[in-house]
Curated annotation (Swiss-Prot):
Belongs to the prefoldin alpha subunit family. It comes from Cenarchaeum symbiosum (strain A). CDD domains: Prefoldin_alpha_GimC (cd23160). GO terms for biological process: protein folding. InterPro entries: PFD_alpha_archaea, Prefoldin, Prefoldin_subunit_alpha. The gene is pfdA. Keywords: Chaperone, Cytoplasm. This is Prefoldin subunit alpha. Its main location: cytoplasm. Pfam families: Prefoldin.
Length: 143
């Protein structure tokens, strides 16, 4: 293996390492979103179970106000691009559960890509080690 080939392979392995790290970060972010979505579903299900529920409304910078929510109130859902819609409890739950399914698909896809890239990375490292080992044996025999 020439030095140029080794450099090229090393660069490709570094790119794969970066990609694996990016996929790991995306996985972590998606897991966080999944937890948040599950908490939202749980909270929406709990609204109105006992008539009127007391909740904390976030005002920003860690500041909250106590408020009461009754079972008949609409739920406001952010649908992206700064837009929000009001939905009844069942429609809100349906929307949240469909979003969870989308996130699960994205998580599986990201995980599969990370695993494939990690396997390619390990294979590439083993191949590079093997090539470097053969190179050192051939050069040490010429001394």
């Amino acid at each position: 293996m020439s030095e140029e080939e080794a450099q090229k392979m090393l660069y490709q392995l570094q790119m794969l390492e970066t990609y694996v790290a990016d996929m790991s970060q995306r996985e972590s972010a998606l897991v966080g979103v999944m937890k948040e979505a599950a908490a939202a579903v749980s909270a929406v299900k709990g609204i109105g179970e006992k008539g009127e529920s007391e909740v904390l409304v976030p005002l920003g910078l860690g500041t909250f106000a106590k408020s009461k929510v009754s079972s008949g109130e609409k739920i406001v859902i952010n649908i992206g691009a700064g837009a929000a819609v009001e939905k009844d409890k069942d429609a809100a739950l349906s929307y949240l559960e469909s979003r969870i399914k989308e996130i699960e698909i994205a998580l599986r896809d990201t995980s599969a890509k990370r695993q494939e890239a990690a396997a390619n990375l390990e294979h590439g490292k083993a191949h590079l080690d093997q090539m470097m080992g053969q190179h050192s044996h051939s050069t040490s025999g010429n001394v």
